[in-house]
Amino acid sequence: MIGITNPDPSLVKEEQADRHRSSVQANPLTYFERYRLLRTALVEAGVDWTDFSIVPMPISMPGLYRHYVPLDAVFFLSIYDEWGRRKKSYFESLGLKVHVLWEVSHERKGISGSDVRLRMMRGKSWENAVPISVAVLLREWGIPERLQKIKRKES
């Protein structure tokens, strides 16, 4: 099961650990667009679509988790910063089973969605930072242009 955080703008709240994550620039895609990207990328990587589920996950609202995911599941995390530690504390506050895959510094994380969005906003090359199938969909949906429009509005 893969959780998509910030699935609905009404479920997004500002987080002290990462104030940017609740911005429009950080969330330019709809839940369904992110669902399609994840599913397409996983299938492209050879994962059978019947082997996974993708669900909305209002990560900043632990009281809602039970409506979206089985609480007896193991919650896997990768931690790169204070926000990752905050997510872990949300899970632990409910007594959920948590498994940290790895914890490395933000600098060692590698490419991030923020990096890709920033490249798009600046009109720089980004396609080599995502799977081919994802690049096709992002271009088809006009996401670079959407991000540039958001940037102009926020400037």
Model-identified regions with their sequence ranges:
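Nucleotidyltransferase catalytic core that binds NTPs
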Residues: 1-155
